[in-house]
Each structure stands twice: as C-alpha cells, then as structure tokens.
C-alpha cells in the first residue's frame, strides 16, 4: 500500500488517462441536458500567471460539478492570439510575431494540461489562424452588404518621426514610445460597425440577464447611456448657416449665454480663415487627448469665433466660441452653455468674462456668485415658463420648439459606433478593396481568407503589410486595385469565439446553426470585471448580429456571469539612489512574522540586507511580485494549487497569496489521501457490509448526520451559491469528525466507507487527480470518478433520534438535557424542572412561567 502521497506521479498518470480516453470530449446529445462552461480565453503572452490559474480553476470546478450532476458538459479552450504585445516582443526578440505567438501557445497549453483542467482540446482554436479569421472576414463582408459597416475619417495618434499610428498605450506623456516625438492627432479613414443601431436592444436586454452581477449591468447601462432630450436648431446671425445641439436640460434654455463648438466644427474651421487666434487654437486642439477622463482633467480653453447665434426662443444673440471640451465625434459637435447651471460652463464663463444668468431657483444656501446651481428645481427669470418644475418645463419648452419648427424631442445614446480599424500588422486583415475611383468594396467570398503573411521582419515602425506595396496589389473585376492594409481591432476575434467553439473545425461555414443552437447560450461565463464594458458589450452585439443572419437563435451569448477577483501578493522594494523603487521578488525575501501574521522583518536572500514591505498588491511584472504557477505545481502538485485557489477567498473577492496557505492546503490533501488509504487497509481488501443491513448506534447515526449535512451544504455552496471556500471548509470540518471515528466493527466500516466515498466525490471537482486515484481504491466499481454521480443527501440520516435542550433559569444557562426527538412539551418541562442542576436554582422559589422553544430551549422563570 502506498504510504506517501506523490502528487507528481499521480497527476502524470491521471492526465495521461484523460488524454488517452478523450475523457472531456463534448458531443451534442439532444437527450441530455447540456452545460456550456467557458472562462475567457487567454492572450498567449508566454506563461500563465496566477490570475489565469484562478480563472480557469473556477471554470473547471464548475464544469466537473455539472458533469457529476449528469449534464453533458462542454468546456473548451483557445487563444486570443492577435495583438500589440506580439509586435513589441517580435521587435525586442528579433523574431516574427507569429513564431513568438505559436511558441507561447505550445508552452501555455502544457501549463494548462499540467493543472488538470478538463478541456475538450479537440475544440482548441487560435484567433490568429486563417481557418478562424476567414469567417470573421466573411461576416464583415455580410455586414457591409447589410449596410451595417461604413468608412469615415476618425482621429488617431500619429508619430511624425516613425510615420506610424500609435495605440493610446504607446503614447507616453504626449510623446511616441520609440521616437520620443510629440504625437499629433490626425484624421484618417477608418471602418466602423453600426453598434448604435442595436443600442436600444443592448440596453433593454440587460434586463434578461438575471444571473449577471448588477455592477456589470450598471456599467453597461451607463456606457450605452440612453437619455431623453431635445434637439434644437440655432441659426447663425447674418448668415444662412445653422447648427443643431442636443440637451437633456431644455428647462435651462432661457439661461444660455454662449454656445460652444468643437474646434473641428465646420463653422469654427470656416471662421478661422480670417482669425489667426482661432486658427492657432484649432491646431493646438488637434494634438489634445480626447478620452473622457483626459478631457475632464485638462484645462478648459476656448477662442471666440466672432460668430453670433440666435437663441431659438428669445431671438437674443449669443456668442459662439470654439472650445476644447467639445468633441466633434460626439453628437453634433456643438453644445449650449448655461453657466448658471453647469459647473464646467460656469468656470469657462468666469475665465473668459462671459455672462452668467440664473434661471433655476436654488436652495437657500445656493449662491450663483460662488458656483453653478446644478439641481433641478423651479424656473425663474424664464418669462412665460416661470414657476414650472423640471418635468413641466421640459414639456412646455420642447412643445414650443416643436410648434415653431426649431426642435424635436429625441432619444440619444452615449454609445458610439465601433471603430474596428487598427493600423497594426498582427491582426486580421480587413477584407475590403479600395478601387481607383475611391470606392471601397468587399473581397469576394471565393477569395477569402485574405491571409496575413507571417514570415515578416518587424522594423518597429511601419506594419509589414503597409510597407510591402506588392501585398496590397490585387485585381477587382479585372481592374488593378489595392487591398485594405488596416487590420481589425482584436476585440473582433474575442466577440464571437464562444460561438465558434460549437463547431470549431467546420470549414464550410462560420458556425453550424444546429450545433450552436444546442450549446448556446453559454451557461456559465467567467472572467475579470475589467472586461465588463468593451468585451462583454461587443460580444453581446456580435451575438445579435449572428442571430439576425440566422446563425444562432438565442438573444444573448452568456446566461450567467462570474467576475473573479484579482490575485494579490506581498510586494518588497528598496529605494534606489535616484529615489525610484526597485521591486524585489517575494521568493528572494526571507520574512519573519509575529503571532498575528504581521511582518516584523524582511531580509534579501541575495545579499542579506533589509528590504521594505509595500503590503499586498496585484501580482504584476511591474512590481516583480508574481508567483510562477509552474514552480508551485512542481513543489506541491496541481491539486494543492487548485485547492488553495478555491479555498482562500470567495471567487468575486481578491485572493491574497500565502505560502503558509499553500502549505495548509497541501497538508489537507495529504490527510485525505492518508484517510482513504488507511480505510482500505482497515478492510483488508474485503467487502464492506451494506449499511442498509446493519443496525447503527447513536455514534454511527451522528456521524452519518454530519456526513449528509455536509453533502447538502457543499451541494448548495457549489451548485447555487458558488461559494467554493465555504464548501471546502465544510468538507474540512467533516474530515475532523472522520479522523476521530473508529474503524473496527462492520458498522464502523460501513459508515466510514460511505463517508470516504462522499468526500472523494465532493472533492473531485477541486482536486481531480487525487480523487481519480482514490476512487479506484474506494469507489467499489469499475466506474471512473469522472463518470460518477454527485453524492445524494439521505434525508433519513438527517433525522435526529434525540435533541439537546438548553435549560435556562431566569435567562441563565443552568443545564443541558437530552430528550427524545418526539418528546412532548410536557415531558420536556418535567425533565427540565426535575434536573438536579436546575433544582439548585428553583428550590424554595415559585415557578412563575415555563417557556419552551421546541427542540432548542427551555426557559424557567422563578422567584
């Protein structure tokens, strides 16, 4: 009998068994309830980090649990393989992005397999392979034909030295990351998909997602940003020109003292011809950042265009300014400014000496001379609209604008169309052809895929396909033409991969509708909350597009969403001579702690000198505090890593890495191993008598009661609540009871066998290698644990023959008595009143009242 737990040997053997037997191959079976579990696929960056391990451990535990519930489970894995990091690594390592990516995929696949995740590897996909992205290209051409794709000029970051477009993260303090040149804002043609056509449905269908975190749904609602407002027209004085503005606060219209245009607004550009200050300001704005966060933080600037706008209701002339806080890409590129009731407008008006008028009554403490009054209230100084509240004023003012053909009520969305063009190399080529006449047409279906050449040299500036004029040359209807040399935003690939998993090897169609409609929607999706908006919103949008061309039937891609927390680790550093922090890996630090676990000393293992602790922070390369999963697996085994990950904190919360915690998890795994082996030894390999044939004593019944209470709790914790940590804690508590139990009589062995089998089954989703091995010892059949059913609660075992009753006298505990479970109130009162310990406090007193809470408490009031 094996006395020592050897995780490496067990795990290698079990993983080979799974591979040889295609244990986790998923096949459609209409007679069986399906369960599609998916964790967000990784970018193949080189090595798995602990965040990956946590994400994929959660998915695997859920998948294995659902399999044991008798469901037909699919859990696939693949690679989100396009993206900028591959280009940067290719430049650094002087290799092609494709080669670097495929090598990383091979290494990370081995890491995932070493952790024992039950993936159907026959469904593996990589988004950088033509057999995947050809269908993305095909689908884009279908969207173009449906009128859902268009091309327009949009602003990008332009490096004038490297002559290339930069991603936002490549702009550091306004300069190009390689050249150091001041980055310019430049307009270039880009492709867009009309996600705004689906804005209302994307918003309304959030109500269907009852098993998504409210936080994620709120973030998406805010991003889509539906608002009810009024669109109105301002005419330009002494001109035939006019412009539209949209506002959600028409109640403040009578307080407009100026209007603000985006610097790129056609009226501002035209006015700049004769206005040098305005022209200079427009040039300055070209290089300004345009994210909402950047704009909120930057100094608000503007220049008077010299134009006057005519107030649509009063006819009053108001100045027209060009301002850097108005974006041409948002709305009409013009806003009405009401400094009395908008703080940004207020500060701008103070800065440039513009009028501030109060048209909304404030609270007593409000002072228009100190700040804008932004709350909604009663109108004042608004002529015929005085005395109206917000709702009344909204209707009255919009009605008047409509009656005079100067405005209309409208629903607006903050959401903007999805710009999918990227001026990068390592991505899916956009399947469009630019003709000599300026028209753009889709690549014919029979010429797809447009294959990205992978044998390239990265020079750090221009994309290889942009630098190679021969690659772009093509023919269209016999005429010379040029291919589009932009590639897709990598969110395109990750927006439909979940659906491709349903038929990943189909080379005749994007998705097999029959298979997709069997597996979809995904029953459980798992990933970080940082993907709450873009990835999850784009996937929901893409799914509706797939539905509308008949490839899927359901409205939403992901039924239930779990957002796991980050993995944290201790961080250590020294201050360099220049004041910078030099981060030191936790594995290179010797730490001493007090009895509360607080660090009292941290010494470098390398030079023996003290280092400083910066506390817990997210594992990252920048802080050098990552823990390599491979090293922990090699030391303790994958099951220990999985158990630690699942036990240390609830899935939505942050997980603090702890070497002591890993040691504790390892000890528990060894305890389970030892208990099972010792039980088998105690039976001398002879059959255990069926528990149904035996008469159990009180101790046996108590142990069975603990067992079945544990099964009930673990089933609920894993299956409904997803509180894996409390499920494991319950199993640990049960193990404490089992460790004290005798294994001598037939009854002892029968109860212990039932308990050991249940423990192995309950731990199977969490520590699958160990449990596969132990089930062969204790399972009692030829069935492998992967095909075993989840343990079922025996309700009869939960029935108690006796109850422990607490007896109080005047509110203080004086005795504990054991009574029959079906004892009457009178019997319990008699036993309690005559208990020796109770009589000490009631003798000589009058019993005033006896209160009995059935099965729990007897309270005697005596004086």
Swiss-Prot record:
Question: InterPro entries under this entry?
Answer: aa-tRNA-synth_I_CS, aa-tRNA-synth_Ia, Leu-tRNA-ligase, Leu_tRNA-synth_edit, M/V/L/I-tRNA-synth_anticd-bd, Methionyl/Leucyl_tRNA_Synth, Rossmann-like_a/b/a_fold, tRNAsynth_Ia_anticodon-bd
Recorded catalytic reaction(s): these are: tRNA(Leu) + L-leucine + ATP = L-leucyl-tRNA(Leu) + AMP + diphosphate
Chief location category? cytoplasm
Motif 'KMSKS' region: chain residues = 618-622
**One biological-process term from Gene Ontology?**
leucyl-tRNA aminoacylation
The keyword Magnesium appears for this protein: no
The protein's name: Leucine--tRNA ligase
Q: Which organism is it from?
A: Colwellia psychrerythraea (strain 34H / ATCC BAA-681) (Vibrio psychroerythus)
């Amino acid at each position: 009998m094996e006395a020592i737990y050897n995780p490496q040997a067990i795990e290698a053997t079990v993983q080979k068994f799974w591979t040889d037997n295609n244990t986790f191959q998923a096949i459609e079976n209409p007679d069986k309830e399906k369960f599609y579990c998916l964790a967000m696929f990784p970018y193949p960056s080189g090595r798995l980090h602990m965040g990956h391990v946590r994400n994929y451990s959660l998915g695997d535990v859920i998948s294995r649990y659902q399999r044991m519930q008798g469901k037909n489970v699919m859990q696939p894995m693949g690679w989100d393989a396009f993206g900028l990091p591959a280009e940067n690594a290719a430049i650094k390592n002087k290799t092609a992005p494709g080669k670097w990516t495929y090598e990383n995929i091979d290494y990370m696949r081995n890491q995932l397999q070493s952790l024992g995740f039950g993936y159907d590897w026959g469904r593996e996909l990589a988004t950088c392979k033509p057999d995947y992205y050809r269908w993305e290209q095909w689908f884009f051409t279908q969207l173009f034909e449906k009128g859902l794709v268009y091309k327009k000029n949009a602003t990008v970051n332009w490096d004038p030295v490297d002559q290339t477009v930069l991603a936002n993260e490549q702009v550091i303090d306004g300069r190009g990351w390689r050249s150091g040149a001041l980055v310019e804002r430049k307009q270039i043609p880009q492709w867009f998909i009309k996600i705004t056509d689906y804005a209302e449905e994307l918003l309304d269908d959030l109500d269907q997602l009852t098993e998504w975190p409210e936080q994620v749904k709120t973030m998406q609602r805010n991003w889509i940003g539906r608002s009810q407002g009024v669109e109105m027209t301002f005419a330009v004085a002494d001109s035939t020109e006019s412009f539209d503005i949209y506002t959600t606060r028409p109640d403040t219209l009578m307080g407009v003292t100026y209007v603000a245009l985006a610097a790129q607004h056609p009226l501002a550009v035209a006015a700049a011809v004769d206005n040098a200050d305005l022209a200079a300001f427009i040039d300055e704005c070209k290089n300004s950042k345009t994210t909402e966060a950047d704009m909120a933080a930057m100094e608000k600037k503007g220049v008077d265009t010299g134009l006057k706008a005519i107030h649509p209701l009063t006819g009053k002339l108001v100045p027209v300014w060009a301002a850097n806080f108005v974006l041409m890409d948002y709305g009409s590129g013009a806003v009405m400014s009401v400094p009395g009731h908008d703080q940004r407008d207020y500060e701008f008006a103070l800065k440039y000496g513009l009028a501030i008028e109060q048209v909304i009554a404030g609270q007593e403490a409000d002072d228009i001379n100190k700040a804008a009054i932004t709350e909604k209230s009663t109108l004042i100084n608004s002529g015929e609209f005085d005395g109206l509240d917000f709702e009344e004023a909204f209707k009255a003012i919009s009605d008047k604008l409509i009656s005079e053909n100067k405005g209309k009520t409208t629903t607006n969305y903050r959401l903007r169309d999805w710009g999918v063009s990227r001026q990068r190399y390592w991505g899916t080529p956009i399947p469009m052809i630019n003709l000599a006449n300026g028209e753009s047409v889709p690549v014919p279906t029979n010429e797809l895929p447009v294959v990205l050449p992978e044998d390239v040299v990265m020079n750090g500036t221009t994309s290889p396909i942009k630098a190679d004029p021969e690659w772009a040359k093509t023919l269209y209807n016999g005429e010379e033409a040029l291919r589009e040399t932009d590639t897709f935003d990598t969110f395109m690939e990750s927006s439909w991969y979940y659906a491709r998993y349903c038929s990943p090897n189909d080379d005749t169609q994007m998705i097999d509708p029959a298979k997709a409609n069997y597996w979809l929607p995904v029953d459980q999706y798992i990933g970080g909350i940082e993907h709450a908006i873009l990835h999850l919103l784009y996937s929901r949008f893409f799914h509706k597009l797939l539905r509308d061309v008949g490839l899927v039937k359901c409205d939403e891609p992901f039924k239930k969403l779990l957002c796991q927390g980050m993995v944290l680790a201790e961080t250590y550093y020294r201050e360099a001579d220049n004041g910078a922090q030099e981060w030191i890996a936790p594995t290179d630090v010797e730490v001493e702690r007090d009895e509360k676990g607080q660090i009292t000393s941290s010494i470098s293992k390398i030079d023996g000198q003290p280092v400083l602790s910066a506390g817990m922070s997210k594992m990252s390369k920048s802080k050098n505090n990552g823990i390599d999963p491979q090293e922990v697996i090699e030391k303790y085994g994958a099951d220990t890593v999985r158990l630690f990950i699942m036990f240390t904190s609830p899935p939505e919360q942050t997980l603090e890495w702890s070497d002591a915690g890993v040691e504790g998890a390892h000890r528990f795994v060894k305890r389970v191993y030892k208990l099972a082996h010792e039980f088998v030894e105690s039976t001398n390999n002879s059959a255990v008598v069926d528990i149904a044939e035996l008469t159990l004593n009180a101790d046996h019944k108590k142990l069975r009661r603990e067992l079945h209470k544990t099964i009930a709790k673990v089933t609920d914790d894993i299956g409904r609540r997803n509180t894996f940590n409390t499920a494991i804690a319950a199993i640990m508590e049960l193990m404490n009871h089992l460790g004290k139990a005798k294994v001598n009589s037939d009854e002892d062995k029968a109860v212990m066998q039932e308990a050991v089998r249940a423990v192995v089954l309950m731990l199977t989703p969490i520590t699958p290698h160990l449990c596969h091995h132990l089930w062969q010892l204790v399972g009692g059949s030829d069935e492998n644990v992967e095909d075993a059913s989840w343990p079922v609660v025996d309700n009869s075992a939960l029935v108690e023959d006796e109850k422990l009753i607490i007896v109080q006298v005047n509110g203080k505990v004086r005795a504990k008595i054991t009574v029959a479970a079906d004892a009457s109130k009178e019997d319990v009162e008699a036993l309690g009143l005559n208990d020796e310990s109770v009589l000490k406090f009631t003798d000589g007193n009058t019993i005033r009242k006896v209160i009995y809470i059935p099965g729990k408490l007897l309270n005697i009031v005596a004086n």
